[in-house]
Amino acid sequence: MAKAVYVGVDSKARKMKKAYVGIAGKARKVKKMYIGVGGKARLCYSAELERYGMAAALSTTRYDMRAATVGKYALFAGGYISKSSFSYHVSSSVDAYNTSLTKSTPTELSCRRCGHAAASVGGYALFAGGASSYNLLGFYENLVSAVDAYDASLTRSAAHIIGAAVEIGGAAVGNYALFAGGTVYSQINKDNVTSDVLAYDPSLTFTTAP
């Protein structure tokens, strides 16, 4: 049974996204709405999230990936695949899911990445920094300076290179994707972390935040 309510607007049926009722002079959001059918209350509208089901599995089993969105896609990139006797196996795979939950596999990252960061800006999903390997002694190896940018067609390009850094944070605000902190050393500790904040605008122009 459909759990949606439609209203007529300009002779067209429009799906109602939000509903409010007045209580004590205040607008209160309706979470669920029921109608009577055969003497029973039947749900006809719900503003709550519902579990849809399972999407196709990732192309490879892995964990500690980074995720970002671009256009109609959610991208999951890099991360660890498994652990051996000496080190962790790191991935360069990218899996993309569209709004129908159909999976595709764009061009892989320019290198394997762990300890990297992701953020979206304009028409791009960015994956920055990290390292290509991590050993069981707690050391990152082969720190990465490259930034991979994926557009809404899932085409990969190279953004302005940052300094090689690992364990950085990524976030988006307004017209900027920010990458902050981390370390340029193989092993992170309180004495070698940085306070640098790097910013990209929608044209992938790079600047250092003041």
Language model features with spans:
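Kelch-like beta-propeller repeat domains
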Residues: A2-G8, K12-R14, V21, I35-P210
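Eukaryotic N-terminal intrinsically disordered, low-complexity segments enriched in Ser/Pro
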Residues: K26-R28
